[in-house]
């Protein structure tokens, strides 16, 4: 079932204003998942919905929620104070915000003469506390709540909020919500809601949730699985490029400079990698080595919520060519118009996330392309591994046409500020830890990782001291770990930030003073030792050496004479010799202490 259908063919009636809203938003036809889900979820069925990314799952649950809410309003005039009707939970703030925006877009067409329907977004922000959410809930009396698990749980636990009237709950990206990171909060929330309710689970990879599905309190759920020859939509092509780690940055710059796209999302493995490469590639842009009209954005989970929302809104509404550097915080569910290229510098630790990342492009039957970089060798086995999950990848080759003298430019940029040197090391260490936790460890083997190649990708001047590197790549480590020649004088390598540099110099001075004190103390100890003690020490050592020599000579003579003494006895003599030597040494040391 791959073709789109007319809204006239929907097997249930929907409100005229909802139909107007759908057409005004440009959804002239419905997708298979919408045609299958809306009639079931609008009625009295719990649903488990699995469909490829970009297939319209959000609208498939928003319309039933609105339909059920309108029926409830008609039957009970209006909801009691402190009660709500529907709850939608998503794993990220960005996705929750997007779902809330979709609901608000529908409500723009809601008739003014009817009792107002309102929605409220519940996500943690630095500017809004749970108390602020409660005040807004009390004042506006919304019937639909949309939020992330932690904030929703905090909200529902307040005495001002009553859950008895909640008739519908939706878990969007349900497999993520039911994994170990969110499972406890989600199960607690579900236990607080009425048992007589409608529950909907939605995801592109719902099967990975396994037995956890049965803990959501559904009653005889209907599974809606839209069949496809691939886990990705037909409008999306997924390709891989085999490239050594040291050339990954050059390949990325080649694609950004030469590939035609309107919007591109580049996925990095860690938050610090995003900020690090965002800063450096902006530097290349200032040098006119990246196309001038390309606008860069960065987004990751360590940013404040308001900053994340603002960045996402800016990237979404940007009219010129734009690139978003991000982590998996922007991998699930987020619908950004006009994204026609997705680049993954490294495969994610979870194969399901790979599908979600790719699904940010090729949405709603638009043409999209997803690329993933794989290291030469073992990592190429990732391709057949994904085929088992019904994801087919085609190899692609790209001629490197990035930036000349890139390594020198990279190192010069780092040498301009010691903070960048620190940043490069932290980014490298974070990646090492990330790679070591890969779930497909049979493919992404930590011990066979190209530690030096990855270090070159991150522009490292010197390898950090890490047990992982010492254990698996000791033979690859250059002298003192330096990857540049000549080595950098770390005593004079300064921070641009005056306060940080002042603190560094102070610490350097303190360390020098401590070192000088230790050196002076050692010299004084040697200098102040009594001449008689020195003589006794020398004489004791000479006596031990002489005794050892006599014993050794006696044993050697035994062996030469061929005495009938067994090998065990000879070995025992050697052991006695060593034992006596240790005992004398111990007694000598003990005597020195006793004399104090």
Curated annotation (Swiss-Prot):
Transmembrane segments: none annotated. Keywords: ATP-binding, Coiled coil, Helicase, Hydrolase, Nucleotide-binding, Nucleus, Ribosome biogenesis, RNA-binding, rRNA processing. The Q motif is unique to and characteristic of the DEAD box family of RNA helicases and controls ATP binding and hydrolysis. ATP binds at residues 51-58. It is found in: Nucleus, Nucleolus. Component of pre-60S ribosomal complexes. One of its GO terms (cellular component) is nucleolus. Residues 248-404 form the Helicase C-terminal domain. Residues 561-596 are annotated as: Disordered. Signal peptide: none annotated. CDD domains: DEADc_DDX55 (cd17960), SF2_C_DEAD (cd18787). A motif (DEAD box) lies at residues 172-175. It is an enzyme of class 3 (hydrolase). It catalyses: ATP + H2O = ADP + phosphate + H(+). Pfam families: CTE_SPB4, CTT_SPB4, DEAD, Helicase_C. Residues 38-224 form the Helicase ATP-binding domain. ATP-binding RNA helicase involved in the biogenesis of 60S ribosomal subunits. Binds 90S pre-ribosomal particles and dissociates from pre-60S ribosomal particles after processing of 27SB pre-rRNA. Required for the normal formation of 18S rRNA through the processing of pre-rRNAs at sites A0, A1 and A2, and the normal formation of 25S and 5.8S rRNAs through the processing of pre-rRNAs at sites C1 and C2. InterPro entries: CTT_SPB4, DEAD/DEAH_box_helicase_dom, Helicase_ATP-bd, Helicase_C-like, P-loop_NTPase, RNA-helicase_DEAD-box_CS, RNA_helicase_DEAD_Q_motif, SPB4-like_CTE. A motif (Q motif) lies at residues 7-35. This is ATP-dependent rRNA helicase SPB4. Its EC number is 3.6.4.13. One of its GO terms (biological process) is rRNA processing. Belongs to the DEAD box helicase family. DDX55/SPB4 subfamily. GO terms for molecular function: ATP binding; ATP hydrolysis activity; RNA binding; RNA helicase activity. Residues 497-558 form a coiled coil.
């Amino acid at each position: 079932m791959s073709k789109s259908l007319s809204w006239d063919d929907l097997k249930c009636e929907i409100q005229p204003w909802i139909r107007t809203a759908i057409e005004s938003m440009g959804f002239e036809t419905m997708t298979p998942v919408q045609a299958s889900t809306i009639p079931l979820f609008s009625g009295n069925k719990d649903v488990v919905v699995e469909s490829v990314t970009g297939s319209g799952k959000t609208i498939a649950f928003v319309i039933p929620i609105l339909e059920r809410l309108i029926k409830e309003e008609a039957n009970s005039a209006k909801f009691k104070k402190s009660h709500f009707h529907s709850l939608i939970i998503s794993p990220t703030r960005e996705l929750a915000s997007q779902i809330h925006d979709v609901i608000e877009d529908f409500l723009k067409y809601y008739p003014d003469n009817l009792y107002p329907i309102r929605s409220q977004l519940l996500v943690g922000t630095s500017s809004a506390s749970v108390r602020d959410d409660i005040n807004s809930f009390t004042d506006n009396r919304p019937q639909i709540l949309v939020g992330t698990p932690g904030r929703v749980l905090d909200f529902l636990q307040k005495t001002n909020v009553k859950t008895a009237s909640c008739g519908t709950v939706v878990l969007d990206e349900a497999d993520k919500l039911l994994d170990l990171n969110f499972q406890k909060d989600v199960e607690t929330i579900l236990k607080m809601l009425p048992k007589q309710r409608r529950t909907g689970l939605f995801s592109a990879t719902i099967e990975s949730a396994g037995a956890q599905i049965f803990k959501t309190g559904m009653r005889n759920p209907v599974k809606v699985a839209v069949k496809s020859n691939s886990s990705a939509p037909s409008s999306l092509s997924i390709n891989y490029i085999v490239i050594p780690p040291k050339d990954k940055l050059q390949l990325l710059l080649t694609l950004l400079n030469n590939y035609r796209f309107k919007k591109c999302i580049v996925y990095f493995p860690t938050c610090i990698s995003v900020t690090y490469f965002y800063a450096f590639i902006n530097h290349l842009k200032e040098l006119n080595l990246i196309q001038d009209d390309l606008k860069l954005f960065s987004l990751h989970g360590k940013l404040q919520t308001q900053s994340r929302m603002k960045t996402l809104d800016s990237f979404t509404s940007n009219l010129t060519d734009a690139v978003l550097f991000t982590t998996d915080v922007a991998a699930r569910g987020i619908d950004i118009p006009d994204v026609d290229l997705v680049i993954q510098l490294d495969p994610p630790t979870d194969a399901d996330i790979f599908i979600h990342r790719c699904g940010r492009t090729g949405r709603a039957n638009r043409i999209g392309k997803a690329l993933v970089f794989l290291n030469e060798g073992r990592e190429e086995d990732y391709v057949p591994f994904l085929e088992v999950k019904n994801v087919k990848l085609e190899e692609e080759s790209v001629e490197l046409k990035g930036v000349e003298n890139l390594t020198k430019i990279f190192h010069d940029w780092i040498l301009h500020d010691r903070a960048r040197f620190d940043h490069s090391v932290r980014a490298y260490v974070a990646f090492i830890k990330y790679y070591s936790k890969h779930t497909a460890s049979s493919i992404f083997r930590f011990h066979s990782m190209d530690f030096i190649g990855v270090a070159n990708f991150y522009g490292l001047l010197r390898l950090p001291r890490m047990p992982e590197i010492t254990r698996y790549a000791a033979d690859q480590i250059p002298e003192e770990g330096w990857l540049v020649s000549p080595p950098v004088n770390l005593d004079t390598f300064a921070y641009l930030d005056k306060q940080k540099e002042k603190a560094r110099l102070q610490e350097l001075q303190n360390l020098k003073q401590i070192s000088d004190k230790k050196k002076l103390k050692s010299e004084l100890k040697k200098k102040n030792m009594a001449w008689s003690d020195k003589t006794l020490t020398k004489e004791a050592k000479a006596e031990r050496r002489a005794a050892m020599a006599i014993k050794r000579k006696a044993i050697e003579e035994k062996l030469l004479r061929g005495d009938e003494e067994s090998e065990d006895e000879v070995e025992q003599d050697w052991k006695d010799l060593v034992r006596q030597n240790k005992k004398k040494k111990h007694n000598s040391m003990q005597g020195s202490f006793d004399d104090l």
